[in-house]
A protein has these predicted regions:
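Acidic, glycine-enriched active-site microenvironments
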Residues: 1-106
Length: 106
């Protein structure tokens, strides 16, 4: 079933492969204590050793700024340390948040 789901995802998104998927979500407590998390799936299964929590340096309640910071920090490190790049990045948020967070750095 996992393989079927991955094949459907590949087909719908017109991707060659989806072996590594990285997903991001932001959170805060009453507009403070901003944090963002990244979960990773490899071949459709959680890769908990690759999960990351990002403490946000900006203390404003700003989802766009938070996502920009996290995407920059994550993929700067991927490029700098020659880490495995994801086949698919999923961001929890609207189209504007995805555009603002990803398109600027990719």
């Amino acid at each position: 079933k996992i393989e079927d789901a991955l094949n459907e995802l590949k087909s719908k998104l017109k991707l060659d492969k989806v072996d590594r998927i990285e997903l991001f979500d932001n959170s805060n407590l009453f507009g403070s204590f901003n944090v963002s998390g990244m979960v990773v799936f490899i071949m459709g299964k959680p890769s908990k050793n690759d999960y990351r929590k990002f403490k946000i340096t900006n203390d404003k309640n700003d989802d766009y700024g938070t996502m920009r910071e996290v995407i920059y920090r994550r993929y700067f490190r991927v490029l700098k340390d020659n880490l495995e790049k994801p086949d698919l990045i999923i961001v929890d948020g609207g189209v504007d948040l995805v555009h603002d967070g990803l398109v600027r750095y990719m």
